[in-house]
Amino acid sequence: MVKRMLEVKLFGIRFENPLILASGVVDMTPELLRRAHNEGAGGVVTKSIGKEPRKGYDNPTIVELPYGLINAMGLPNPGWEAFLNEFIDERFDFPVIVSIFGGTPEEFAFLAEKLEPVADAFELNLSCPHAKGYGMEIGQDPKNVYEVVKAVKDVTDKPVIAKLTPNVNDITKLGLAAERGGADGVSAINTVKAIAIDIYAKRPILSNKVGGYSGPGIKPIALRAVYDLAKVLDIPVIGIGGITSWRDAVEFLLAGASALQIGTAVYLRGFKVFKEISNGIIEYLKEEGFSSIRDIIGLALKV
């Protein structure tokens, strides 16, 4: 009964809890995804998969800061064929959301069509802030967001989630464009544009010079984005950005998030964060007199 308190259903898919492993945190082997689930994740998102293999950027690709990370990985991935071959015979008892990226609507659609056999849903990486030609340039323009989402929905019946960038003046325009294109949900936010400089070397630390900032430092930005999106959209919002504790998780749920993705906290503290956060949410629900997590979603929108 206690476990059922955290159960959510999104896009017709059952998640035993709303805490989802975010894309790009761990290697995408089936074994590691199972480990994430066994240690408390309600579902997983794979690393972003592209049409061709990508090595990614040279080290250093991550800078640790007091309140998070700046990363510029460069979308390293084995390409769709190798990924499909690795996963095609695997069977999972939890939802696997496949993240895909491309430079055009046609590339996104191609990948969705090819990877449909191994995906319970797709997350469209429309918002990578450090990979030239992929993501950010597409994801900042509502027209492009609409076209990418529509192209993918035209070739697959699987649920489609548009991952939105915070690096715009009004994120709700992106969310509404995704909804018009047929998206089943949106996830927000991706990383915030950032840079770190070595004051002695007198140069940027990352090999790519610039990257994306994640972790506790962006939580208020992410929370505002979720709040704004949940007010205007009729599709679910998945909250991402700086969730490190059950209190953070509850804030996002109250702001209108139907589920949550956790990334940087897993990188810094390991998979144990899933059970820590789940246990904290359960205690909060009991103390506040709620029987289900569904009872608190969006309560802050009603005041």
Curated annotation (Swiss-Prot):
Places the protein is found: Cytoplasm
Keyword Membrane: no
Cofactor mode of binding and number, as noted: Binds 1 FMN per subunit.
Coiled-coil zones: none
Catalysed reactions, as listed in the record: (S)-dihydroorotate + NAD(+) = orotate + NADH + H(+)
Entry keywords, A to Z: Cytoplasm, Flavoprotein, FMN, NAD, Oxidoreductase, Pyrimidine biosynthesis
Residues at which FMN binds: S23, K47, S48, N125, K163, I189, G215, G241, G242, G263, T264
UniProt keyword annotation of Chaperone present: no
GO biological process: 'de novo' pyrimidine nucleobase biosynthetic process; 'de novo' UMP biosynthetic process
Any Pfam family matching the protein: DHO_dh
GO CC aspect terms: cytoplasm
UniProt pathway annotation: Pyrimidine metabolism; UMP biosynthesis via de novo pathway; orotate from (S)-dihydroorotate (NAD(+) route): step 1/1
Binding site for substrate: K47, N71, A72, M73, G74, L75, N125, N190, T191
EC number from the UniProt entry: 1.3.1.14
Cofactor(s) listed: FMN
PROSITE patterns linked: DHODEHASE_1 (PS00911), DHODEHASE_2 (PS00912)
Top-level class of the enzyme under EC nomenclature: oxidoreductase
GO molecular function: dihydroorotate dehydrogenase (NAD+) activity
Active-site residue list: C128 (nucleophile)
Subunit relationships: Heterotetramer of 2 PyrK and 2 PyrD type B subunits.
Family: Belongs to the dihydroorotate dehydrogenase family. Type 1 subfamily.
Annotated function: Catalyzes the conversion of dihydroorotate to orotate with NAD(+) as electron acceptor.
Protein name: Dihydroorotate dehydrogenase B (NAD(+)), catalytic subunit
Organism this protein belongs to: Pyrococcus horikoshii (strain ATCC 700860 / DSM 12428 / JCM 9974 / NBRC 100139 / OT-3)
Taxonomy of the source species: Archaea, Methanobacteriati, Methanobacteriota, Thermococci, Thermococcales
